[in-house]
């Protein structure tokens, strides 16, 4: 199984609490989400436990930006959330609704 996942998805927002900036993320669903779920299951079987909150460590490339973060499972098992921090959004000039090409390396 390849540890690299490539996909495109829109930048979305979620309001966590009134008075705070929204959280920005990309939803990883469909075939890409299933590939990641298979990887997470194999790691859990190998190690005998899950990481905190069921997260998966990844290295991300969006445009010219590259960083490490974690993916988090969506409720109901329907894919994963990839959070995008403000410095990345500013560097890549991303706004809500933009279609983003993402490359993930599962760590």
Q: Which residues does each predicted region cover?
A:
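Long, compositionally biased stretches
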Residues: 1-78, 103
